[in-house]
Curated annotation (Swiss-Prot):
Keyword Cell wall biogenesis/degradation attributed: no
Protein's job: Component of the virus occlusion bodies, which are large proteinaceous structures, that protect the virus from the outside environment for extended periods until they are ingested by insect larvae.
Organism expressing this protein natively: Agrotis segetum granulosis virus (AsGV)
Alphabetical keyword list: Viral occlusion body
Gene Ontology annotations for the cellular component aspect, listed alphabetically: viral occlusion body
Protein's name in the database: Granulin
GO MF annotation terms: structural molecule activity
Family: Belongs to the polyhedrin family.
Domain of life: Viruses
Pfam family, one: Polyhedrin
């Protein structure tokens, strides 16, 4: 369309059609076309989506209806060797491979009113202790272990998978066909904390054996925070107290 030999000369630039303004126009045309295209496809799929929304099931129970009540069991630092997995909780008696339990968050069970426990989630938060270490956390877990099975403290990595986004992993402990009978756990939790898990949780939920490692080639120090999250449906939900000049 134009003389190619004049392409790089200064004074012949005015006759060239493709300048910056022209590029801008092309770009905005493209954007316009894309926007209209998106609107058309949205209008096309909207009734289908409305229909699908009626049958939608939340995949992750953590996101579902209900309230999440967390009890942090412990927070500690462990050294993990390469190509091995370390057991986090062996649930034998009161000790989780440790002498004392640290109960963070609250001294008593935070659930007071009549509440139905829909689900129990085992949550794991992992953090590297040294800065600038580039490795990913791996884990393996078993749910249906025999109650008398004595788990090994350290195992070789079998087929691990990478710990989920944000270095947080949640394991759903619900057993199929088991409903949880108690509606008020606070008294039970307070009077015998030592037997709380054995007597009141493990008959109705899976008891997880969780192993954690990483794909680094050196010994790494890992900060492990373990908590149990109760998924709760409230019969008497919390109502905000009215405060103001009229009350």
């Amino acid at each position: 369309g134009y003389n190619k030999s004049l392409r790089y000369s200064r004074h012949a630039g005015t006759s060239c059609l493709i300048d910056n303004q022209h590029y801008k126009q092309i770009a905005s045309n493209g954007k316009d076309v894309r926007r209209k295209d998106r609107r058309i496809s949205e209008a096309k799929y909207a009734p289908l989506k409305d229909l699908a929304n009626q049958y939608m099931v939340t995949e992750d129970p953590f996101r579902g209806p209900g309230k999440n009540v967390r009890i942090t069991l412990f927070k500690e630092i462990r050294r993990v060797e390469p190509d091995t997995h370390k057991l986090i909780c062996n649930w034998s008696g009161k000790e989780f491979l440790r002498e004392t339990w640290t109960r963070f968050i609250s001294e008593e069970f935070p659930i007071t009113t009549d509440q139905q426990i829909m689900n129990l989630l085992f949550e794991l938060q992992l953090r590297p202790m040294q800065p600038n270490r580039c490795y990913r956390f791996t884990m393996q877990y078993a749910l249906g272990a025999h109650p008398d099975y004595v788990a090994h403290d350290v195992i070789r990595q079998g087929d691990p998978y990478y710990v989920g986004p944000n270095q947080i992993e949640r394991i759903n402990l619900s057993k199929k066909g088991y409903a949880y009978p108690l509606t008020c756990l606070q008294s039970v939790y307070n009077e015998n904390f030592d037997f709380f898990f054995d007597e009141h949780l493990w008959p109705y939920f899976h008891r997880p054996l969780v192993y954690v490692g990483m794909n680094s080639a050196e010994i790494e120090e890992i900060m492990i925070e373990v908590s149990v999250i109760f998924k709760i449906k409230e019969f008497a939900p919390d109502v905000p107290l009215f405060t103001g000049p009229a009350y």
